[in-house]
Amino acid sequence: MRRFVILGHKVPTSGEFTLNDLPGTAGRIDVLCRAVGAALFVSHGIRTNTEVVLLVQDAVQIRIAGDRVKRLNPDERSTAAILQLALRGAAAEEVETTPGVVAAQASLSQVLDRLYQIEAHPIVLHEHGDPVDQFSFPENPAFILSDHLDFTDADEATLADLPRISLGSMALHTSQCITILHYLLDRDEGDTSADLVLCHKVWGEPKARLITGLLEDFGIPSNLMSHAVPSLYPGMLDGLGEVRIMVRPRDLERARAIIGDYFEQPVDE
């Protein structure tokens, strides 16, 4: 499951605002509505593998489950109406205010506690984070983003120990970041079924594992394939056969450069 946690800093927690002025009296709830759309909508459908968590003023949590939500439409006004109902209905315990939308009083720390309980992996989106192309996404990622404002000092303190990634030096809208993250995750899922290509050949599994460990440090997954020339087959029994390091096609150039910088010139066929 993918999750996107968006912190809204100005939306009235009471839900008392007019749908005719989303950027104004609604505290830029239009930013949250666009984030919901980017996270959940695909052409003619909903991403059922995605959950959106909106945290309003560190006080109210709204969860929207892609596999359960109903009556969600692409326009911001109708999405704002759903969020308004959630804000008005939020209580100490979780309440389903519309199908697939659950609201409750909660703080950022409580949101993180829930993520850990369901074995999600929180990751902060930040302009000064590590480059995303050097990051290996874990299973069940939960990306934490801010709205049109920077994280507050209190937010930063709560998120201080979490990994941070950046999508580049240019500041992007929250919804744009979500679209890019979906693309990267979709691409990675496609790569799981793609053919791996030969990156390097070494003699002996211990050395191969040193190299694959280095590649993993750079966010490049790899597989090992043992290969023995028939006349040398007994050597495989002692772990001394030829071992091939296989990577995804899109990682090949960078992986070979890393091996060349830290070990030796890569050997291919």
Protein language model features and the residues they cover:
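Hydrophobic anchor at the start of a short beta-strand
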Residues: 122, 164, 222
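Structured adenosyl-cofactor binding patch, chiefly the S-adenosyl-L-methionine
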Residues: 153-191
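Long, charge-patterned amphipathic alpha-helical coiled-coil/hairpin "stalk" segments used as oligomerization
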Residues: 104-107, 125-133, 141-151
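RNA substrate-binding interface of SAM-dependent RNA methyltransferases
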Residues: 1-126
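Acidic/polar low-complexity segments and flexible, solvent-exposed patches
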Residues: 191-269
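Anion (oxyanion) recognition and catalysis
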Residues: 116, 160, 216
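Short, glycine/polar-rich helix-capping loops at beta-to-alpha or helix-loop-helix junctions
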Residues: 150-158, 228-233
